[in-house]
Swiss-Prot record:
GO biological process, one term: auxin-activated signaling pathway
Signals that turn on the gene: By auxin.
Expression sites by tissue: Abundant in seedlings and roots. It is also found in the shoot tips, flowers and leaves.
Gene that this sequence comes from: PARC
Protein name as annotated: Probable glutathione S-transferase parC
Amino acid sequence: MANEEVILLDFWPSMFGMRLRIALAEKEIKYEYKQEDLRNKSPLLLQMNPIHKKIPVLIHNGKPICESIIAVEYIEEVWKDKAPSLLPSDPYDRAQARFWADYIDKKLYDFGRKLWATKGEEQEAAKKDFIECLKVLEGALGDRPYFGGESFGFVDIALIGFYSWFYAYETFGNFSTEAECPKFVAWAKRCMQRESVAKSLPDQPKVLEFVKVLRQKFGLE
């Protein structure tokens, strides 16, 4: 597809934006990256995502695709002729991949946020829920190198961005992911060896500093 315009409206610590950075990198799609100031959202963001007014937004030839998981599927469908395939070819396997991506969105984000945004009993409950969620994901991974089997794919893309926040989660939740979920950490390190992932995820200490600023704003520091 020649003369295509692809723009990504994003914010660097967003694990949801990281999904699109990784998917575009895997498909080797050239795009323009536009960093958003979420305290002063651009007219383009408000125009392209008038319903939710949030990032990330993938803009393809002037048309917006909102919600990160939907946008990853869009990337696969539009550039399906470009290797690698991000979704399994089998309909059942595709359905399972979508199930786990949905599970990640509904469970992991909220538990992780509570780890740094709460204190006391609420934080302890969030830590228990967070670790339990990771153990469920470890069970889904099984003994395979990636969630899709031998190849990096849809569920890996949906999940790996959270790993950049783990240092912050562990710091404020006072636990070790490696001690609790070693198989999960081994998977994450395997993913980090991929160029598409390594260049799309910010350093964990940088995310920690960002979260410290957020905690100060919330009066938690």
